[in-house]
From Swiss-Prot:
Annotated region described as Disordered, given as residue ranges: 1501-1524
Free-text cofactor note: Binds 1 Mg(2+) ion per subunit. Binds 2 Zn(2+) ions per subunit.
Protein name, entry field: DNA-directed RNA polymerase subunit beta'
Enzyme class: transferase
Domain of life: Bacteria
GO molecular function, one term: magnesium ion binding
Recorded name of the encoding gene: rpoC
EC number: 2.7.7.6
Protein's job: DNA-dependent RNA polymerase catalyzes the transcription of DNA into RNA using the four ribonucleoside triphosphates as substrates.
Binding residues for Zn(2+) 2: C1112, C1194, C1201, C1204
Annotated positions binding Zn(2+) 1: C58, C60, C73, C76
Amino acid sequence: MKKEVRKVRIALASPEKIRSWSYGEVEKPETINYRTLKPERDGLFDERIFGPIKDYECACGKYKRQRFEGKVCERCGVEVTKSIVRRYRMGHIELATPAAHIWFVKDVPSKIGTLLDLSATELEQVLYFSKYIVLDPKGAILNGVPVEKRQLLTDEEYRELRYGKQETYPLPPGVDALVKDGEEVVKGQELAPGVVSRLDGVALYRFPRRVRVEYVKKERAGLRLPLAAWVEKEAYKPGEILAELPEPYLFRAEEEGVVELKELEEGAFLVLRQEDEPVATYFLPVGMTPLVVHGEIVEKGQPLAEAKGLLRMPRQVRAAQVEAEEEGETVYLTLFLEWTEPKDYRVQPHMNVVVPEGARVEAGDKIVAAIDPEEEVIAEAEGVVHLHEPASILVVKARVYPFEDDVEVSTGDRVAPGDVLADGGKVKSDVYGRVEVDLVRNVVRVVESYDIDARMGAEAIQQLLKELDLEALEKELLEEMKHPSRARRAKARKRLEVVRAFLDSGNRPEWMILEAVPVLPPDLRPMVQVDGGRFATSDLNDLYRRLINRNNRLKKLLAQGAPEIIIRNEKRMLQEAVDALLDNGRRGAPVTNPGSDRPLRSLTDILSGKQGRFRQNLLGKRVDYSGRSVIVVGPQLKLHQCGLPKRMALELFKPFLLKKMEEKGIAPNVKAARRMLERQRDIKDEVWDALEEVIHGKVVLLNRAPTLHRLGIQAFQPVLVEGQSIQLHPLVCEAFNADFDGDQMAVHVPLSSFAQAEARIQMLSAHNLLSPASGEPLAKPSRDIILGLYYITQVRKEKKGAGLEFATPEEALAAHERGEVALNAPIKVAGRETSVGRLKYVFANPDEALLAVAHGIVDLQDVVTVRYMGKRLETSPGRILFARIVAEAVEDEKVAWELIQLDVPQEKNSLKDLVYQAFLRLGMEKTARLLDALKYYGFTFSTTSGITIGIDDAVIPEEKKQYLEEADRKLLQIEQAYEMGFLTDRERYDQILQLWTETTEKVTQAVFKNFEENYPFNPLYVMAQSGARGNPQQIRQLCGMRGLMQKPSGETFEVPVRSSFREGLTVLEYFISSHGARKGGADTALRTADSGYLTRKLVDVTHEIVVREADCGTTNYISVPLFQPDEVTRSLRLRKRADIEAGLYGRVLAREVEVLGVRLEEGRYLSMDDVHLLIKAAEAGEIQEVPVRSPLTCQTRYGVCQKCYGYDLSMARPVSIGEAVGIVAAQSIGEPGTQLTMRTFHTGGVAGAADITQGLPRVIELFEARRPKAKAVISEIDGVVRIEETEEKLSVFVESEGFSKEYKLPKEARLLAKDGDYVEAGQPLTRGAIDPHQLLEAKGPEAVERYLVEEIQKVYRAQGVKLHDKHIEIVVRQMMKYVEVTDPGDSRLLEGQVLEKWDVEALNERLIAEGKTPVAWKPLLMGVTKSALSTKSWLSAASFQNTTHVLTEAAIAGKKDELIGLKENVILGRLIPAGTGSDFVRFTQVVDQKTLKAIEEARKEAVEAKERPAARRGVKREQPGKQA
């Protein structure tokens, strides 16, 4: 037996849960091998993970057949089982890095953001890698403020905290720095021309563009000087004096050779070479001028240079050592000289300097590295490197600590204040930071930074969610709820609701971040080969593929240790791939199909919207055993029949027919029978006979889309017909809103006997005669039927001799013989009004009269005298015939004569009343027979009457011309008055419109007067008068004048259309007309959609309302007023009869009422007669209002009780338990919505025709509880009005005892209250629509409920739609279902929390019982959409709108759906808990007396057995709580 589902719970899945669902990890993005068409291993369709493609067959084919079931093939690893497992076996993708679930990120408000107290923007910045979030600040300080946990940091801020504060100053090419690399700088110091440091710190070069190497040169050289002039020293520094010569001195060569002169910046070397070998090297200091040139050959003793005055060392050369040899008066100095020779190297962007500033290099050391070894710079000799022209200077905030001895830290270490750096503890750090050891300058730099833990992406968010202590957070937020600021409290409440949802449901916040992504079973995302060898695939496969590709790439990059920026980008792309899979297009641009702009359908798209799983597949499935065809009229059918084409019936009833054929021996077995049916030509007559037998006693359902109310589907007994069309009974057309201009209908077969019984009893067309919306007949004569019946019951009034008086009947008859008086002319005989016909033809009984008609003696329309049941009736044979027709149909002549009025012609309304009265007095079956009779005779007489219309039937009255001339004269006067300045332009416009409206009205009256007096049998007139077709406005346009037209803007043209259609319109008139007509058409199209949407919203808000019990026992009631204030005078007047009927009919009296001497007891169902009695009593001033039970005050949870609901209007009897009255209410309100909309185009956009612009939008505004645009100012208190007027504004004061309330209004406000008026709270002070929310605050829920019902009714009444108040009340009750907590008392509720009134009341009862403080609340008014979304059933809400939001909220709270309403049960494929599916009906058994006796005896025995102790041992006892 199938287990019955009791509840459905939705929750978050933990990563472990997701992995436990999975049958294996999908590692590759491959799907199917296009050659073998087999799934790829580890791919999205892998058979090892998801199961075999063919039943009981592994992938390699080693194991086939069912006997190997459950075995896993050792070759291919596929389990041998049914292929259906591919519909529910899931896989998973293990993510390389966690990813957030977009529903919990982008929902409004974001669930993750709410928990972590991050805004949506902040959360997005972290998840998509544009900002860091702090997990552990570790004492970090940013701009003098301590960094906090969960603070967001930009890349710069993070780098500053993690790697120190630094600023980069770019330098233009060719500009050299003014500070050295590694030099300490202060704020404001110039780093380069025009570049100033904004920071204290250390300047570091970035990408120097030029390197200067100062090579150290050494040379041993000699110099002979006069001894007396020599300034003796052991070494000479650059620029020091060597000698002071008193007179010029010539320095001579001491060897012969070739001169080689090497000049320095100052001074020079002179080398003498012999055969290329140097023989002597001389030093020429500053002050000594060479006398020889390079390459000159010199002799020994030849002067080489001349010296004068001071001789000194060049500025860049020093003598490290001096050896002196004195020879007589001269001294020969051997000098060991050292100097630097700079060499510059350009550094290109692709090259890299590998030594620091000031570094000493040896010959062969690399200074600049490059990709091409040829471009590298290698040291030519020993030297010192200097860096120049950096691309930029980086100033790092760092402390510099010089040291002497050994360093105790190394580069990259992190230190805190007080940590030892060098020199055995003498040098210590006094800041947090990262160490850089500079051995060139013997310093330790500590770059000020922190070991802060801040991260990006879902990983960081997951860590924070894991660390959340929900209990502590709850306590903290409860404290915050005591804060005086309302905004702070509201924010805390929202967070607290989420926290509690997690706490109560047992979900963990970190589960909102995915570590593994589940992979949908492959048969739910199929891939099929289409013609041409290409593959058609579900969009999900593309989305999964993207995800797997990115995931695998990220894994690879992580394994390779790729740079942070690449990893970060890949992680972001992975997050975006997960987002696209879950909800494509929710963030950023949607992922589209390659080659088109169509966004891919993600999992969210598959669920939500009209084409989503909920609405397309769960709430509305296509069904088998159905067909559709065009409908044609079937006038010969009975009300409960429909004509079904034979071929269609054959297909629909095929299984039944096959069985019957086998039974009757037409075919040996079912297979043969099926083959016989497939060969269409071979179908024998026996088959058709068998089909007749099969359908005998069965019913089928006919449906016409759009199904706006329950009468859009009705059951009929099929009658087999030739042809291809379904034949429909004319009288059900109104319920279906069907006509025969090409409409199609669908046929469905209820299969089970239960379904057949239900269709036959509940849905048969003959059982659905009254409208559930108003209780009026829906199956009633219309069109031709009315015309025929009106034709025979109309009487002739002739003019000839009318008004003549005769003394005796004989005189009158003689005058008639002479042709002076017509048969039907009204005359007086002996002072009594009569006619010749009544005198001449006196019949003893109705049969005689009808016989006379048959013999052509009198016409059906002549007035004659008939004796009947002891009475003399003056009536026409036609009316007698009509009475006879009714009598035969209802099989009760007495009742028939009571039902019909013989003194009026039978038109639309009288026929409707006849049907209704017949229903009340005679019941359903006889009424159905009556309808068939009326249909038959109506068609017969409308045919034989020969009534049809031609152009000449549109008769134009003589008076029209005169009325138009009169109007033109008045028009001239208005224009003159305007010209002379007596009227403003607006007044002139209004007066012209008024004039033409009056003129049109006069012409209309003239048209009808003309018809009545001169052409009473004019077909046009007959049709309009009888209600068969056309209305006075259309007749006016045909015969009178079209009148005023509307502009596209909705205003009215002041020039009317003077012509009628009979006369034809001028070009200008035609043009003017076209606007309105087109607007009507456009309106219709647009508003049909709005109306359908409204119906959908109404159904969604009311579907759970079912009649659940007989009496809820409430003492509350509503008072239906019988009077209402006049719009203009504000004095009370009796409400319209129809309005009172809509409020009272079928209700239960809540208090006893005695009127006009009749006592109506409490608990009585008010019939229409009772209502009429109450109206009479109101007219007599005996009663002002009637106390009745109402759904608004019903105490039944999730529904209403019989008493509060009253009559089932479609049956005119108390409603049955289990009736889905909520849906009936929604349909009753929604169905006319489309009529309202479509009403426009009938009048072709004539001005004055009620255009629904006030209609539907107003209804929607009321049901959505929107604040109206032009809203009235309402008084918030009871009091007396005082008005003060100033230059720019009006002040209206409402004053009550010791209290006054002021309302400031603009000068042009149209006041409703006068100075000194007494007003009540909630009463409008100015014109406009009342804001229901304000009314609720001022006057309470009852006032709002009455206001909404009344305002909605106003719109429907304006359109002539009858609708019972209780339908609107049911919807309004659902709008008023919720309350807001103002003080939680001793409960766990929160201030501002919204929940159902029932729940609060139940909670309060419990609190009071426990002696605790109850919850204080205020009523809320919610629009139907919001109310529907707030329902407890998450299945119902999710299938309505905002699917993702509803499911997100429900999942977090771990909501359980109790399956109370209808939608949730339909979604799960259960019987709906209404009608025959309600427990009341399902568990009610119908038994005969014998069974009843047996049950009674069994019950007695059970009681006795219970009283006897269980003596025998081993008696199996039922476990408590288990159902036996």
